Amino acid sequence: ITGTSAGAINAAALACGADNFDRAVRRIARVWRQFHANQVYGADSLSVMRSGARWLTLVSIGWALARWRRMRPQSLLDNKPLEKLLVKMVPLVRLPRLIRKGHLKALAVTASSYSSGEHVTFFESAEPVKPWVRSQRKAARDRITHEHLLASSAIPFIFPAKGIEVDDHIEYFGDGSMRQSAPIAPAIHLGAERILVIGAGRMHEPKNDAAANPTPNYPSLAQIAGHALSNIFLDALAVDVERVQRINQTLSLIPEEKRAHSALRPIELLVIAPSQRLDAVAARHVGDLPTPVRTMLGALGVTSNMADVRGAALASYLLFEAGYTQELMALGRADTLAMRAQV
């Protein structure tokens, strides 16, 4: 099982319940159905004001305070509540035994190093897999910890980077979706030949109405930030799926006796992705956010108007609220049932 960003958390939770997969899925679903923002980050007025004040201070007189590191904000929001939730809900201490008993072949989570610029996949495996090295990305065999999960899901600017030891030194990591050129590769390196890809990308979603009818208004900060984050989080998977499909097509044209001498092998993919635009879904739930967070986003141009999806992409990265997560789960179930024959 491999995962990146929020997918790393889901992957780890599934892996920790690999001896009873159905129970693990139900447990994860129960958490997502009852989710609230305060389980992920400090969403109260004091926490939001404290973070906002630090950023304002940095912008206004940061040049004068540069020598005082403790004044520099590390992120927009504090995700200590998420750390507590992970410790409670993801018992990583079970992994070695599950791997040893054959319930799980491997778990891999990916994060992006701010220190080296490399994209690193951390993995535990039953097989003696040699860590791979490719251009700007590599793998490291390691005991997966909650720090790895926090690093993989540390959305840039929004959540703080996490320090993890790599090759006997500490590097600081952020969200694994950054600079991720080959999200399917870890599963292939770990030996998978049939891969179920569950993503939040744009492969199956309808065309954006805003693209057909662009607004003449200057984009808000929220719209610009949402566009930038969407490019980070949503585009790489679709490109990698197309790459694997092209390689499969090429291999199908090569005679089997010659293909046997190649390191390449065909990979069977089944891709499940949303059939609706997630920013449109998010726009219906912006009003569910805690008032302090909604006020902060409002200053950037996010509105609670369900018809206005322009800033909703940014809000979707903070929308850890039950109304939104339940609608996403219902969408995922419907999209999967629509593909029941392939599944």
List the model feature ranges, each with a label.
Residues I1-K80, L86, F123-S135, R143-E147, ...:
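Patatin-like phospholipase
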Residues R72, R100-E193, V197-A228, R310-L319:
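Active-site gating loop/helix substructures
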Residues N79, E83, V87-V90, A106-A111:
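Extended catalytic-interface subdomain
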Residues D209-T250, P292-M296:
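Acidic, Ser/Thr-rich peripheral helices and adjacent loops at domain boundaries
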